[in-house]
């Protein structure tokens, strides 16, 4: 290698960088990730990361997008073959499972705003489409579907955040609490049929 030059590692691309960052985030927490640490885990020099990301803030944004793409894939798979309230429940459970299995990436996902720019708008396009298809099949209006997406997002993200931070201290099963909460939430959805 020529002095002063940083050679790119063969096979290294943005996807590899983001996936390695996701592994580190899940293991150590998103706030613990530093570019030097990420570079070392990839066996490259820190300046080489700038061939793929613009810095730490950009890396966090990429992790947010990565997480939403991953969770969208899981939720769409969960909804396949189900319909109505069973499909809605399936996508909620898929979100919960992904978020609690990937706590570091989930932390990056929390501040996602679909309307921030074109890239973020495209990230969950299929997911929103399936949500609208499910609620439409239940005779729930598009306006109320938007309210439901916000409501369930707040419930799911809040519940998962508490689980990931071990904030439920009672000995009752967290899984049972989630099941009950989801049942109550879906019961409330039924009040919106025809509205």
Protein language model features and the residues they cover:
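Basic, helix-initiating cap at the start of DNA-binding domains
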Residues: 1-28, 32, 36, 58
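Alpha-helical structural segments
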Residues: 16-23, 27, 41, 58-78, ...
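Append "Primarily bacterial transcriptional regulators
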Residues: 33-40, 49
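Base-recognition residues in the alpha-helical recognition helix of bacterial helix-turn-helix
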Residues: 50-54
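Hydrophobic alpha-helical connector segments
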Residues: 76-104, 142, 149-152
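Amphipathic alpha-helical segments used for helix-helix packing
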Residues: 96-117, 159-169
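Amphipathic C-terminal alpha-helical segment
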Residues: 108, 154-171, 186-195
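Amphipathic alpha-helical packing segments from all-alpha helical-bundle domains
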Residues: 114-151, 176-187
């Amino acid at each position: 290698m020529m002095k002063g030059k940083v050679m790119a590692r063969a096979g290294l691309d943005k996807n590899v960088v983001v996936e390695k960052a996701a592994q580190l985030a899940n293991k150590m927490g998103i706030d613990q990730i530093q570019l030097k640490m990420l570079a070392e885990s990839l066996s490259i020099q820190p300046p080489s990361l700038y061939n793929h990301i613009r810095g730490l803030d950009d890396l966090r944004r990429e992790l947010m997008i990565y997480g939403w793409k991953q969770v969208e894939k899981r939720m769409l798979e969960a909804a396949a073959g189900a319909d109505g309230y069973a499909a809605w429940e399936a996508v909620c459970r898929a979100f919960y499972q992904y978020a609690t299995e990937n706590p570091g990436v989930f932390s990056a996902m929390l501040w996602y705003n679909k309307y921030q720019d074109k890239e973020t708008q495209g990230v969950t396009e299929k997911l929103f489409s399936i949500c609208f298809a499910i609620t439409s099949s239940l005779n729930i209006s598009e306006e109320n579907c938007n309210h439901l997406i916000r409501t369930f997002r707040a419930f799911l993200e809040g519940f998962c955040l508490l689980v990931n931070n071990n904030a439920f201290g009672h000995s009752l099963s967290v899984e049972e609490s989630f099941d009950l909460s989801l049942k109550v939430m879906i019961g409330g959805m039924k009040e919106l049929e025809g509205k």
